[in-house]
Structures are given as structure tokens and as C-alpha cells.
């Protein structure tokens, strides 16, 4: 109905605006056909009526090429720039290295030469000093020897010769002692530098030789010593000159010359750091730095407020930017105080002005890149040291912009907020001093014995393990436990049935014990702010028996949740797990002879331990099972956060009726509610068009046939598959527009489908399905790997159908998915009966984490709350380096309220979990779908969805299992845009984008949190233009900038989170000539500061500079404008603004119809011919007696007035009638409008009608004369006084009828005949006569 109202309103508006429509019926009918086409849009099957389709698609693809390929073009341009930069740097580095090597050799030679000179100088100084000190003593010694030699005779020469030899020996001995004594004195001399490093043996030899050969010593010793020093230089200790080396090295470091001690890698790193520092200074400089760096074909030019990177000087010369109002280089940043209640509003606005000063025409495409967010939580606490933003920015780890999803994933807890870490410590998750307290019920022993035994066996520091029993209540009997088991329910108020973490001084356990009923929040396991609630041994036994009853298996899976930061592969943890296994095996072998061994399985990094317990127990020996569990707990209690047996999950299809799991009643919990839909302020909103008359005028003036056929052209450009089946599910979530804006997705983005598997050979899935290779980190056997990962055979077809909805390939065959160009990972955990256990689900989630999948689809669930799965899903928050993974879950198909009867994992209260309900073709929540205004987030198509099934087939399925994949596909498109921009978004932010861009659905009752439908176009567009921090209007995604034109681009900002956000607005510039290879990008850095605790924080003005938009403003792109405006004319977008506009238009339409009817009526009465025919129709030949008598009376009264006032009625009316009856009397009886009979004044009725008796008329006149004396008030009340006696006459129905009988006419038969001849009757027309006639008519009728 609303569609019809809206379309009819638009038709009427067009009719009002265009007068020529009245004369052009074909045009009007063609417009009605156009609107009718829009009304039938939801059920259409696409067709192709274009003859020259090949050329048309080529033109259309060329028109959209900047949108489809802009990211690839930008990435290739950046890759080329880096290659050229690397190549140029490589060549420069080689030249620099060669220069450095030459310089280094030269410096080394100089250093060696200097060392030789210094060493030689130092030795010469020491030797000269010793020689000078020993010369006098040595002369005395030589003098004595020479005197002895000259005395005596020749005969005594032999004796003298012998004596000389003996004296020389004595002299040598004395010389040695003399030199040694001098050297000893030299060592004690404080003026000698490095005296301890000198080679004194060498000095001894040199001094001795110089003294002995005094005459030749100066030349020989100098040459000989130099040669010996050169030979012994390499063998001598370089440490003799440490001080000299230190001075030289310091001089070189001060001059920036690399020394020999530095490694080559250090030198390269040092140079690269210098380059980074230099470039950083240039990019952030506030001075006018017009530096030009031409790296091959890539030119980088840095301006005050932005940077241009291009391969052509034409762009540098033609394009100019004014970014002074927005760039962080000019204004430092935009300060917006964070407010939780207003974080969804865009409150501040700035402008970017782009101008084309050249001769070419350019295509402009806008996007954002390299966003960074710094959480300031706790940084500026009073107790901590305050740091500047520059210091904080230096601490932020830079993420690589390539291979974001490659490698092996893990869980990263380092980015926990301060509050999360405190909560974790309180829960005991990361605190080694926190212990598990067992509240055990032992029916065989009394309470005191239990407390004593457990306090003695388990204690840890100040914490105690208490086996607390309620002394006022007896333990449940065997019969009662058996009844509870058969009823599949437990007692919520049994505090004995829980295990909780608590500290010694914590009163939470006491408060919990005192609280009762559902109103106690501590009973709710979903409350993350409370202590962890753990099942005790008795509950585990009940779970074991229940699973044994429902599933006849040889083993049951006991899953233990270990602390997240433990390394299960460490030697210590392996020993702990093996010891626990051996103790458990020993206990089983003591009681069961047929038992062999126990197997277990671990899952890291999710840190789950699964122990397969054999089905050896039943109701008769469950005490043995209880004791075995206590043994296991005693070995692992220091490392365990929770434990329970595996639960069962089922898929959500509409034909599912019976729930197989036991219903574990839980108190209703307020779901984590996303922010309400408030994407833009009214002033800057895309939705502002609803309240603006201009779009309506533009719509009314849309006469261009090309523009009117744009939608048809776009539809024909879509994949061929869409023309072979109904696309209502893709149409209503606006996937087609999303594809035109950002393409079909990105292959690097992985979506993990945890379901019943998939047909990996399906023609529509094979191109996108990815089978991870076997990895030891999967920690599964080869058979298990084949079952879950390598060959996930889909027996039910459910998983294949879900996978096709998410990412069916666009290959002109079959169907196409929401995101046709992404990577799909199908993991099987559901068996052929559509059921699966929590152990397999957790193993599948672990594989998703290891493969870095940011999106996980869960079209399954259970009403049983599983703590293990709860913790596994919680740890998805810490994947992808703390960014988190999104879990999209189906809400269920039982038409229940999930707020009261929750289904898991859809109602897990985590910000990265998203619950999806189903919507039908009528835009109403499907009758089978679960709902919940506190627990279900969004709606998606889930009714009669056509998708893939095994064996290359297709089928229509219905259920919320089909709704969740649509949201998964839209999430994949959002992640693809983020990948193209070079970053991984926060999981919570992705879901917030889906929520805020969703399409509002009109409903009489609130059924979900937002009552809105997922909107692929809005989500992609919001991500494309800056996300929830910053937005630009849709029209500026792409436009043409012609010669001499300008474009003012408004940008709005919001304080989405508390912290500091930075990004780059990138404006891609492409010549309109498709053959040109010119390309350029403008990078404008943006900073948004929202933390008011930052020093010197002051809110920025809400508006920046004022700009005037004139006739030189560039026009919007035609096709893109249609996509942007389609939000107004799209019949599926039901927003509150849309509803208001529709209602206003509807009333305007009704008013227009009413005015038109009045106008046409007046025109009809003014027509002479139509008025005559209307008068003729008043005289009906055949009538009853009453009507006949009335017509006769009217004719006789007319004749009477002609006789009374004469032929000139206009002249005598006031003279006779007004004077006789009075002015007041005339107004009293002017009770109705008088028809215009002036045109009939020339008609004479005397020959047609017999004259009435004068007596009858006199009776009327007398009555009027009596009434003349009475007041207006009494006359209106219908009172009549007779003459002077004022006798009252009663105007009752009886009196009126009697009065009518008093009128008698003559020649009644002839009058009737004359009346029948109505064609000849003409009434004299006079205004005064008509007024009097009508007054009398009213009087007679009363």
C-alpha cells in the first residue's frame, strides 16, 4: 500500500509541475508504465532487450572502470613506485657503497700510516730518552776500556786481547744492567704515556745496539726499526694505541663517516633511517616545501597540506587542491569530544576544493587509505606519566599493508583494554594466584569430612578450595536426581551445583548465595562482568548421562577450557596433560578390566583440551565417574577455566520442528545492543533528500530518455545469472549498487563457513572454495582432516546452499552470491542428520583462526547454553592481531522470542557476534523466524532463496540459515574494501557499519534491535568514504572534472571512539581519455582527536571556512547520481524520513485532487450548455404525488412573484419586497446559495402555467408580516407569533403537512401536462426573484 501511495504521489507531482502533460496522454501513460515497472521490480526476472549488447557493455564497463579497477590501479601504481624507488635506491646504494669503500680504504691507509708514524714517534721518543740518559754512563765505561787498550807493549798484545775479550764481556754485562736500570726508571716516570703498553724487550735491544754501534746507529737503527715495525705491526697488540683509536672513531662518528667497526647492514639501516626521518619531516612539514623527487617515471611533490604522486607533469600543472581546511599539516587535527550518546552523529564539517586549470578532462575517484587508531584508555591517568602525542605515535606498531591475511593466525591478548585486563584478573583467567573452588555434594560423606579432606588436599597460597554444602538443605536424593534427569532440567536455585572463581576477600559468592530467582544477575552465564559460572561434578555426570541417552556413541567428549595465554606445546604443559591422562587411565583400569587407554585432543591457539571418556558408566556406577572427574580436576585445576561435556547443535531450516537438546533454563539477559540507526546529521545526510524539495523537482524534470533508461542499462550489465532467476533477495539488500561501487570483493578476504560441508566440485563454488593444506597446528589426525577440511562432503545440502549464497561465482552459470570474488573455506562439523557436537564446532573455529578468516558463518545453534562454545566465541575477539573476527549467527526458526528463550551462539553477548532474522518478500519478518528486540540485530532475506546444492544442482530453501549468509556476504564486501585500502578493520566496527547503514523496516511491533534490513550499498559506500569516523556524500565517489571547473567536497566527522584516529584521503586522478596511461593520486592526511583527557584538548569549530559555490561547479556523474538518488526512489528503503515524505506527498496529492474537483465543478457550472442540461434534469416527468406537488408549488410561486413585482423585477424588488418584509427578515431567511438564473430572464411563463389564487399568496404574506415583528433568535428557533396577540404556532410535521394541504391550484391537470413538456419550460432569470424563491422554499420545507 505504501508503495502505491508513494508512486501515486510522485505521479501527481509530475502532473502538477508539467502542464503539457494535460495535452500529451501518451507521455503521461508512459510515465505510469515506468512507475508500474518500479512496482513490479521486486518480482521481476531480468531480461535483455538491447540489440548491440557487446558495444553497450563495453561502454558501460569503461564508464565504471575507475570504480571497478581503481584499487587495482592504485595498488599497481604503488607497486611500480616502490619498484622504481627500490631500483633507484639500489643503483644509488651501489654508487654510494663504491664511494664508501674507496673512502674506507683511503681512511684505513691514512689510519695505518698514522698508526705507524705515531708508534714510530713514540718509540723514538722513548729510545732517545733512554739513549740520552745512558750516553754519559756508557762514555765513562768506554773510556776505561779505551785506556786499557792503548797502554802496554806489543808483546803483551795477546794477553791484552784476551783481557779485552774478558772486559768486553764485563762491559756487555754492565751495559745490560745499565739499560735495564734505565728502563726500570722509565717505567716509574709518570710523564711517559702508555708506558705499560710498550715492548721493553724491543727497546732494550734497540738501545743496546745503538750504544754499541754509536757511529752507525742513527741511520741503520732507523731503517731497521721501520722494517721490523712494519713486519711486527700485524702481530703487535693494537691495544697499545687504544686512546688514539678512540679519538679517531669519535671524530669519524661526529663527521658521519662509517668506521671499520660498523657492519654493512648497520650502515644500510642507518642510511635508511636517515631517509625515513628526512621524508617524515618533509611530509609533516608546515613550511612551503616544494620538493620534487622523480624516481624514474614516478613524481612525488610535497605541498603544505597534501602530497601529489603521479607519473605525469600534466597532473601537477593542471590540478590544484585547497586542503587547508582539513589537513592535519595545516590545522593539526580536528578535536571532537567523545560522547557515548552522540558517537553516531557526524557533527563537524570541512571542505576540500579541487580545481582543474588545464585543458584536459579528468575522472576523479575518492577513497581513504592507511587508517590508524590509537586507544588512549588509561594512558593519561593521574598516576601515570603523561606523554605527548608524538611520543605515543612512535609507540604504535606500523602494520604491513600487504599480505594482511596470509600466514598462520593466532590469538593476541596484548591489545586488551585496561578494563578487560582487570576483569580477566578478577575472573581468574590470567591470575596464577586465583584458584577454582569446588562446591561438591558427596552423599556418602558428611559435610565436615568433606571440608577437612579437601582443605588438606588442595590449597594454594592464601586461596582455599572449599567443598561448600548447604547445611540447611539436604543433598538431592537419588530419586530426585533421576526425576530431574528424565525432565531434562536442573534447579536454578541450587547453589551447590556451581563452581565459581572467587578470591579470599571477595563477597560475590556470598551475594550469589543470598540471591534467588531469575532476577539475580549472577545466575546468568552471559554476564561477562560477573564471575565465571562453572558446572560442578554432579552436573557433568548429568550431562554424561543425558548425552548417553540421546547419542549412542562409544566415547563422549569432555572439553576443558584452558587459560588462553598458556602454551600447550611447552614441555611443562605436555607433562601436566600426560600425567593427568595417566592418572585417569590408572583409575579406569582399576575398575574396568575391558578398558584399554584414554585419548585426548588439544586445540591451539584457542586452548581447548578434549578428553574422550569411554561409555563405561551408567546410572548404577555414576559415583565412579564422579570420582574420576575429581581426579582429573585435581591434576588440571590450576590451568582450567571451565569444563563440560559436548553439546549438540542443529541447522536452522524452516522444516525443523523438534529441539533435540535439553532446555537449560536461563534468566533473560539484555543483549549487547548496537547503536541505533543514525548515520548522518540531517544537514549532511544522504537522507536529507527526503525533506528537500529539490530532489523532487529534479525527479519531476527528468525528461531525458537516457537518464530514464539508466536503471535498465545497469540491470543489463549485471551478471548473466541474474537474468535466469528471481533476484528479489539480492535486489532488496541493494547488492547491485554495491558491486558498482566496489566490485565483487577481494580474493584475499576469507569467509569460514562452519556447517555441513560443501560440494567442492560444484561449478558455482569451485572457483572460490579454498582447501587449506594439512598443518600440524590443526592438531588433528589425517582422517579427521579429511572429514572436516579436505573433503567436507555435504550429505544434507545445507552447507552447500549456505556457501552459494555467500560467494557463488559470477561465471554466467547458475546463480551468483552476494560476494562473488572472495575466498570460501568450508568446514564440516554437521553430520548427515543435520546435527553436530560442540567439540567439532570448536575444532572448526580453531581452523578458521589459524587460516586468518575474519568472517565466520554459523547457520546453526542450540537452546542449551554451552560454556565451552561461549569461551571459544569470546576468544574470536583476539584474532588478527587483536582486531577480532566476526561471527554471523542465525536466530532460529521456531517463531520464538530469543529474549525469553535464547538460542546459542546467536544470543552470546559479545560485540563481535551478530544475530540475523529472516524477512519475507513482503518486507515483514518471516513467520517462522525467531525474533527479539534485545537479542536479534538485523534482518536479511531468508524466504524462498535459490542457491546451490550438491551435484551441480540448485534448489530453493527457506530459513534463517539462508538469512545469515546474506549478512556474511555483505561483511565480506566491507572487508574487501578495507583490504583494498590497506588495513584490517575492527570486528565491532564492521558490525556497527552494517547496523547504521541498514534500511528501516516499517512494522507495527518492534521485533529486533533496529528493525532494519541489511544494506550492502550503504555499508560499502560508508566504508569506501571513511567509515564511521569520516564521511563524504555519495556523489563524490566518482565525478568528472572538466576544464576550468571546481568541485567543493564536503567532509563530515564524528567521534566514533575515544582516542586518536588518522587516515589519508586519497583522490585518484585519471584522464578521461581511456588510452592514456597518466595516473596520479593526491594524499591528504587527516587526524581526529576525541579523548578529552589529552593535554591542551580544545574542541574544534563545527564548521570550517566558508566557500561560495558558483556556476563553475563540476557536475555529478550521471550513472553514479542515479545510484545515489535511487535511495529516494527505491521502493524498498523504508526509513522514517521516507515514511514522513510519503505521508506528506499523499496528503498533497489528496489536496490536489480536491482542488481539481472543485475547479472542474465550477467550470462545469459556468458552461451554458451543461447548465441548461442540468436544469432540464431537475424536471422528471414521472414522479410520485409528493414530488409532483412540490414542483407545482415552485412554479406557482415563480408566477406569483412576476405578477406581484411586475415585469421589471430588478427595479421593483427592493421597493416592494424589502420594504414589506424588512432587511433583517431577508437575512434571517437567506439560508442557502442561490443558483444563477439570470440568463433565463427573457422567458415568459404566463402562457404555460395557470395563475394561482390570490388568496393563497395572501396567506403567505400575512405570515411573513407577523414574523417581521419578532427577533432573529426566535425566528431561527422555528417559532411563529400570530398578529398582535403573539399567539404561538407550532411548526411540527403535522402542522406543516396541514399547511401544505391549504394550497390549492386551478387547472391542475393542464399544469401537469405543461410540466411534462419540460423542454419548452423557461424560467425568468433574475437574482432577486431567485433569492426570494429560495427563501420561500426553505420556509415551506420547514
From Swiss-Prot:
Extracellular face residues: 688-1137
Signal peptide stretch: 1-18
Record text on activity regulation: Activation may be calcium-dependent. Inhibited by the non-covalent interaction with the cleaved propeptide.
Residues bearing carbohydrate: 165, 343, 451, 455, 493, 551, 642, 729, 821, 857, 893, 951, 1010, 1106
Post-translational modifications: Proteolytically cleaved at the N-terminus to generate a 74kDa intermediate which is further processed into a 72kDa form. The first maturation cleavage is autocatalytic, occurs in the ER and is necessary for the subsequent SUB2 trafficking to the microneme. The second cleavage may be mediated by PMX/plasmepsin X.
Region (Disordered): 85-111, 143-171, 415-474, 500-531
UniProt topology in membrane: Single-pass type I membrane protein
Compositionally biased spans, kind Basic and acidic residues: 503-516
Active-site feature positions: 755, 798, 961
Annotated localization: Cell membrane; Cytoplasmic vesicle, Secretory vesicle, Microneme membrane
Keywords: Autocatalytic cleavage, Cell membrane, Cytoplasmic vesicle, Glycoprotein, Hydrolase, Membrane, Protease, Serine protease, Signal, Transmembrane, Transmembrane helix, Zymogen
Reactions catalysed according to its record: Hydrolysis of proteins with broad specificity for peptide bonds, and a preference for a large uncharged residue in P1. Hydrolyzes peptide amides
GO cellular component: cytoplasmic vesicle; microneme membrane; plasma membrane
Propeptide: 19-687
Biased composition (Low complexity): 430-474, 518-531
A GO molecular-function annotation: serine-type endopeptidase activity
Pfam families per record: Peptidase_S8, Pro_sub2
EC number(s) reported in the record: 3.4.21.62
Transmembrane segments: 1138-1158
Membrane side Cytoplasmic: residue ranges: 1159-1342
Record carries keyword Aminoacyl-tRNA synthetase: no
Occurrences of domain Peptidase S8 (ranges): 727-1020
PROSITE patterns per record: SUBTILASE, SUBTILASE_HIS, SUBTILASE_SER
Sequence similarity: Belongs to the peptidase S8 family.
Protein name as catalogued: Subtilisin-like protease 2
Species of origin: Plasmodium falciparum
Gene label: SUB2
Amino acid at each position: 500500500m505504501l508503495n502505491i501511495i508513494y508512486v501515486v504521489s510522485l505521479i501527481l507531482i509530475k502532473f502538477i509541475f508539467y502542464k503539457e502533460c494535460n495535452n500529451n496522454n501518451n507521455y503521461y501513460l508512459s510515465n505510469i508504465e515506468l512507475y508500474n515497472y518500479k512496482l513490479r521490480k521486486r518480482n521481476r526476472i531480468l531480461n535483455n532487450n538491447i540489440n548491440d549488447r557487446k558495444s553497450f557493455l563495453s561502454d558501460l564497463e569503461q564508464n565504471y572502470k575507475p570504480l571497478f579497477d581503481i584499487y587495482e590501479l592504485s595498488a599497481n601504481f604503488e607497486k611500480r613506485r616502490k619498484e622504481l624507488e627500490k631500483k633507484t635506491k639500489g643503483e644509488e646504494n651501489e654508487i654510494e657503497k663504491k664511494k664508501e669503500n674507496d673512502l674506507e680504504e683511503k681512511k684505513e691507509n691514512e689510519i695505518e700510516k698514522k698508526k705507524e708514524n705515531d708508534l714510530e714517534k713514540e718509540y723514538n721518543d722513548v729510545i732517545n730518552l733512554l739513549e740520552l740518559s745512558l750516553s754519559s754512563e756508557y762514555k765513562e765505561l768506554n773510556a776505561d776500556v779505551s785506556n786499557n787498550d792503548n797502554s802496554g807493549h806489543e808483546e803483551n798484545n795477546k794477553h791484552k786481547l784476551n783481557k779485552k775479550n774478558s772486559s768486553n764481556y764485563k762491559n756487555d754485562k754492565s751495559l745490560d744492567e745499565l739499560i735495564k736500570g734505565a728502563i726500570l726508571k722509565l717505567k716509574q716516570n709518570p710523564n711517559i704515556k702508555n708506558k705499560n703498553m710498550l715492548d721493553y724487550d724491543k727497546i732494550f735491544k734497540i738501545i743496546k745496539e745503538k750504544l754499541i754501534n754509536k757511529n752507525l746507529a742513527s741511520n741503520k737503527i732507523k731503517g731497521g726499526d721501520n722494517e721490523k715495525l712494519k713486519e711486527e705491526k700485524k702481530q703487535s697488540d693494537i691495544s697499545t694505541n687504544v686512546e688514539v683509536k678512540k679519538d679517531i672513531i669519535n671524530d669519524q662518528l661526529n663527521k658521519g663517516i662509517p668506521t671499520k667497526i660498523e657492519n654493512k647492514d648497520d650502515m644500510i639501516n642507518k642510511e635508511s633511517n636517515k631517509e625515513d626521518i628526512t621524508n617524515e619531516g618533509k611530509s609533516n612539514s608546515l613550511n612551503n616545501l616544494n620538493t620534487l623527487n622523480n624516481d624514474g617515471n614516478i613524481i612525488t611533490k610535497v605541498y603544505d597540506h597534501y602530497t601529489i604522486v603521479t607519473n605525469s607533469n600534466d597532473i601537477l600543472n593542471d590540478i590544484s587542491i585547497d586542503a587547508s581546511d582539513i589537513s592535519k599539516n595545516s590545522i593539526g587535527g580536528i578535536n571532537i569530544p567523545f560522547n557515548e550518546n552522540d558517537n553516531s552523529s557526524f557533527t563537524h564539517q570541512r571542505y576540500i576544493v579541487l580545481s582543474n586549470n588545464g585543458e584536459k578532462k579528468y575522472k576523479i575517484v575518492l577513497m581513504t587509505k592507511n587508517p590508524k587508531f590509537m586507544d588512549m584508555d588509561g594512558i593519561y591517568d593521574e598516576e601515570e606519566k603523561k606523554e605527548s602525542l608524538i611520543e605515543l605515535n612512535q609507540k604504535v606498531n606500523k602494520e604491513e599493508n600487504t599480505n594482511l591475511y596470509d600466514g598462520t593466525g593466532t590469538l593476541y591478548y596484548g591489545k586488551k583494554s585496561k578494563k578487560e585486563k582487570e576483569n580477566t584478573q578478577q575472573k581468574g583467567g590470567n591470575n596464577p594466584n586465583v584458584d577454582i573452588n569446588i562446591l561438591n555434594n558427596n552423599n556418602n560423606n558428611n559435610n565436615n569430612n568433606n571440608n577437612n579432606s579437601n582443605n588438606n588436599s588442595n590449597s594454594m597460597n592464601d586461596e582455599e578450595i572449599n567443598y561448600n554444602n548447604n547445611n540447611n538443605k539436604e543433598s538431592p536424593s537419588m530419586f530426585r536426581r533421576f526425576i530431574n534427569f528424565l525432565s531434562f532440567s536442573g534447579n536454578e536455585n541450587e547453589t551447590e551445583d556451581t563452581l565459581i572463581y572467587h578470591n579470599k576477600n571477595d563477597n560475590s559468592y556470598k551475594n550469589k548465595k543470598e540471591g534467588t530467582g531469575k532476577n539475580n544477575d549472577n545466575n546468568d552465564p552471559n554476564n561477562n562482568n560477573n564471575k565465571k559460572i562453572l558446572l560442578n561434578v554432579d552436573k557433568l555426570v548429568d550431562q554424561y548421562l543425558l548425552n548417553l541417552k540421546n547419542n549412542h556413541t562409544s566415547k563422549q567428549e569432555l572439553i576443558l577450557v584452558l587459560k588462553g595465554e598458556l602454551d600447550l606445546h611447552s614441555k611443562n604443559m605436555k607433562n601436566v596433560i600426560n600425567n593427568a591422562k595417566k592418572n585417569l587411565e590408572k583409575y579406569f583400569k582399576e575398575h574396568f578390566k575391558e578398558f584399554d587407554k584414554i585419548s585426548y585432543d588439544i586445540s591451539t591457539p584457542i586452548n581447548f583440551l578434549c578428553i574422550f571418556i569411554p561409555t563405561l558408566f551408567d546410572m548404577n556406577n555414576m559415583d565412579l565417574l564422579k570420582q574420576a572427574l575429581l581426579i582429573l580436576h585435581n591434576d588440571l585445576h590450576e590451568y582450567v577455566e571451565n569444563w563440560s561435556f559436548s553439546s549438540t547443535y542443529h541447522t536452522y531450516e524452516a522444516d525443523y520442528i523438534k529441539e533435540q537438546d535439553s532446555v537449560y533454563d536461563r534468566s533473560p539477559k539484555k543483549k549487547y545492543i548496537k547503536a541505533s540507526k543514525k548515520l548522518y546529521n540531517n544537514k549532511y545526510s544522504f537522507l536529507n533528500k527526503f525533506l528537500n524539495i529539490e530532489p523532487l523537482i529534479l525527479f519531476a524534470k527528468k525528461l531525458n530518455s537516457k537518464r530514464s533508461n539508466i536503471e535498465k542499462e545497469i540491470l543489463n550489465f549485471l551478471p548473466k545469472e541474474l537474468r535466469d532467476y528471481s533476484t528479489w533477495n539480492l535486489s532488496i539488500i541493494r547488492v547491485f549498487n554495491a558491486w558498482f561501487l566496489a566490485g565483487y570483493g577481494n580474493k584475499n578476504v576469507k569467509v569460514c563457513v562452519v556447517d555441513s560441508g560443501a560440494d567442492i566440485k560444484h561449478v558455482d563454488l569451485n572457483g572460490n572454495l579454498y582447501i587449506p593444506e594439512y598443518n600440524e597446528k590443526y592438531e588433528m589426525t589425517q582422517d579427521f582432516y579429511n572429514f572436516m577440511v579436505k573433503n567436507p562432503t555435504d550429505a544434507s545440502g545445507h552447507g552447500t546452499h549456505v556457501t552459494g549464497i555467500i560467494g557463488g561465482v559470477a561465471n554466467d552459470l547458475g546463480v551468483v552470491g552476494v560476494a562473488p570474488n572472495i575466498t570460501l573455506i568450508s568446514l564440516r562439523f554437521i553430520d548427515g542428520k543435520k546435527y553436530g557436537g560442540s567439540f567439532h564446532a570448536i575444532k572448526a573455529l580453531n581452523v578458521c583462526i589459524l587460516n586468518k578468516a575474519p568472517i565466520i558463518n554459523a547457520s546453526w545453534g542450540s537452546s542449551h547454553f554451552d560454556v565451552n562454545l561461549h569461551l571459544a566465541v569470546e576468544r574470536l575477539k583476539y584474532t588478527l592481531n587483536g582486531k577480532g573476527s566476526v561471527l554471523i549467527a542465525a536466530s532460529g526458526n521456531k517463531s520464538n522470542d530469543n529474549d525469553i528463550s535464547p538460542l546459542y551462539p546467536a544470543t552470546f553477548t559479545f560485540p563481535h557476534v551478530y544475530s540475523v532474522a529472516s524477512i519475507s518478500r513482503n518486507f515483514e519478518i518471516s513467520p517462522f523466524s525467531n525474533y527479539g528486540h534485545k537479542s536479534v540485530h538485523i534482518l536479511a532475506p531468508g524466504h524462498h532463496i535459490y542457491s546451490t546444492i550438491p551435484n551441480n544442482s540448485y534448489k530453493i530453501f527457506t530459513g534463517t540459515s539462508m538469512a545469515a549468509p546474506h549478512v556474511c556476504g555483505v561483511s565480506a564486501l566491507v572487508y574487501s574494501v578495507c583490504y583494498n585500502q590497506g588495513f584490517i578493520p575492527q570486528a565491532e566496527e564492521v558490525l556497527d557499519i552494517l547496523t547504521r547503514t541498514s534500511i528501516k523496516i516499517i512494522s507495527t511491533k518492534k521485533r529486533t534491535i533496529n528493525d532494519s534490513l541489511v544494506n550492502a550499498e550503504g555499508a560499502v559506500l560508508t566504508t569506501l568514504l571513511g567509515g564511521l569516523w569520516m564521511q563524504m556524500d555519495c556523489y563524490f565517489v566518482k565525478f568528472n572534472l572538466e576544464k576550468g571547473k571546481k568541485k567543493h567536497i564536503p567532509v563530515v566527522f564524528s567521534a566514533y571512539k575515544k582516542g586518536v584516529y588518522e587516515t589519508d584521503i586519497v583522490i585518484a586522478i585519471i584522464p578521461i581519455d581511456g588510452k592514456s596511461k597518466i595516473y596520479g593520486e593526491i594524499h591528504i592526511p587527516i587526524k581526529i582527536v576525541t579523548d578529552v583527557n589529552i593535554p591542551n584538548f580544545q574542541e574544534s569549530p563545527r564548521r570550517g571556512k566558508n566557500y561560495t559555490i558558483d556556476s563553475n561547479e563540476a557536475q555529478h556523474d550521471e550513472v553514479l547520481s542515479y545510484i545515489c538518488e535511487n535511495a529516494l526512489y527505491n521502493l524498498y528503503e523504508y526509513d522514517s524520513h521516507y515514511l514522513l515524505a510519503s505521508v506528506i506527498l499523499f496528503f498533497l496529492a489528496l489536496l490536489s485532487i480536491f482542488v481539481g474537483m472543485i475547479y472542474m465543478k465550477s467550470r462545469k457550472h459556468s458552461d451554458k450548455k451543461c447548465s441548461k442540461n442540468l436544469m432540464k434534469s431537475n424536471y422528471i416527468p414521472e414522479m410520485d404525488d409528493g414530488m409532483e406537488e412540490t414542483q407545482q408549488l415552485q412554479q406557482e410561486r415563480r408566477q406569483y412573484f412576476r405578477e406581484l413585482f411586475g415585469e421589471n423585477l430588478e427595479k421593483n424588488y427592493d421597493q416592494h419586497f424589502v420594504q414589506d418584509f424588512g432587511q433583517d427578515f431577508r437575512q434571517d431567511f437567506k439560508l442557502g446559495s442561490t443558483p444563477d438564473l439570470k440568463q433565463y430572464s427573457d422567458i415568459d411563463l404566463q402562457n404555460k402555467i395557470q395563475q394561482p389564487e390570490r388568496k393563497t399568496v395572501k396567506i403567505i404574506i400575512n405570515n411573513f408580516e407577523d414574523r417581521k415583528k419578532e427577533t432573529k433568535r426566535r425566528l431561527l428557533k422555528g417559532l411563529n407569533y400570530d398578529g398582535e396577540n403573539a399567539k404561538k404556532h407550532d411548526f411540527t410535521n403535522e402542522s406543516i403537512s396541514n399547511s401544505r394541504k391549504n394550497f390549492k391550484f386551478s387547472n391542475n391537470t393542464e399544469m401537469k401536462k405543461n410540466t411534462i413538456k419540460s423542454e419548452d419550460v423557461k424560467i425568468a432569470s433574475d437574482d432577486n426573484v431567485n433569492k426570494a424563491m429560495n427563501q420561500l422554499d426553505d420556509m415551506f420545507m420547514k
